[in-house]
Regions:
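Bacterial N-terminal signal peptides
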Residues: 1-7
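N-terminal pre-domain/capping segments
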Residues: 11-102, 170-174, 200, 267-283
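Histidine-acidic metal/acid-base catalytic patches
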Residues: 12-22, 33-36, 132-136, 142, ...
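Acidic-and-aromatic substrate-binding clefts and catalytic sites of carbohydrate-active enzymes
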Residues: 27-34, 49-61, 79-91, 115-119, ...
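Residue-level detector of anion-binding/catalytic polar loops
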Residues: 48-49, 71, 106, 144, ...
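Conserved beta-strand positions in the central sheet of alpha/beta enzyme cores
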Residues: 51, 74, 108, 146, ...
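Surface-exposed, polar/charged faces of alpha-helical domains
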Residues: 59-60, 129, 193
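Active-site acidic/histidine proton-transfer and metal-coordination neighborhood
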Residues: 85-175
Length: 283
């Protein structure tokens, strides 16, 4: 049955209401590793959730987050489109049926292949049945699935997410816009047009401080992933543009390889986020 994609929601007006949460990599280099301490830090700083990453730790992490009224906003979830038997961790079914049921979690799938080069649509024939099955499973339990654009992975561009969303053709399946990976591939060109392209399918967004402009294309991660209060890329403008197009989902904070202690990075980034919220209301 064909499904017409609808915008993700009505424009929010003059407020930035999206939930804000850090990626799991905010803690993996220089932060607490225990879920109790992680959840406590996030609650103390005012975040609204966290990203799930380690499937072994996810049940305990979710328990600690839920105790503090925080959410598992997204789960960074690998899918091998070449596999005929077990393309992804089967525990996701049990988790969705139990502690993640009807929480609205978004499974952000990073897609891998050794048979197909990045962005090769010839891999669609292998990927689409896998993604439909995962999407249908998620739908049964109130969850969504978004293609995570990641440089050098099979689905590396936002166009891959858009193409797959059209072909998978499920209401709870869409695309992610990960700022650092988009900048690395496209260098920040034609932002408004690219947001128009992805808006009907947009289910997940991540931001960070970053170098902006044409120099961003092909830049290293130290330039493209910084604390949110640094970098030349205009995140406030970006947030205005995605919310103007109806995006009401969570905003993730990309923190890969940031060398600052987790508390310092997250404190600074939360301060920048609150500044964005204040500037939204002032305009």
């Amino acid at each position: 049955l064909a499904v017409a994609f609808l915008p993700t929601g009505l424009a929010q007006g003059a407020e930035l209401q999206n939930h804000f949460y850090p990626f799991n990599n905010s803690m993996r280099r220089s932060g607490p590793s225990d879920p109790v301490q992680q959840a406590a830090l996030l609650a103390d700083l005012g975040f609204e959730g966290f990203e799930g990453y380690d499937m072994d730790l996810l049940p305990r992490l979710a328990e600690e987050l839920h105790k503090r009224d925080l959410e598992v906003a997204t789960i960074y979830f690998g899918v091998d489109i070449d596999s005929k038997t077990q393309p992804y961790d089967p525990r996701i079914a049990e988790y969705l049926e139990t502690f993640l049921k009807d929480t609205g979690v978004i499974i952000t799938v990073h897609l891998h292949s050794k048979k197909f080069l990045p962005s090769d649509p010839a891999g669609d024939q292998s990927a689409i049945p896998i993604l439909r099955k995962l999407s249908d499973l998620a739908h049964q339990h109130g969850a969504k699935v978004a293609v995570y654009n990641h440089v050098n992975f099979w689905a590396e561009s936002i166009d891959d997410g858009i193409r797959l969303a059209r072909k998978v053709n499920r209401r709870n399946f869409g695309a992610a816009f990960n700022l650092c990976h988009w900048l690395a591939l496209e260098g920040g060109e034609n932002l408004n047009q690219r947001l128009d392209d992805i808006a009907p399918y947009l289910l997940s967004v991540s931001i960070c401080g970053a170098k902006g402009g044409p120099e961003a294309k092909g830049a290293g991660w130290n330039d493209l992933i910084q604390p949110l209060d640094t970098g030349s890329f205009d995140n406030l403008h970006f947030l205005r543009e995605i919310t103007k197009r109806g995006y009401q989902g969570p905003i993730g904070l990309q923190c890969f390889n940031i060398s600052l202690p987790a508390r310092e990075n997250l404190t600074r980034s939360m301060s920048a986020w609150r500044g964005f919220r204040a500037d939204f209301e002032d305009k």
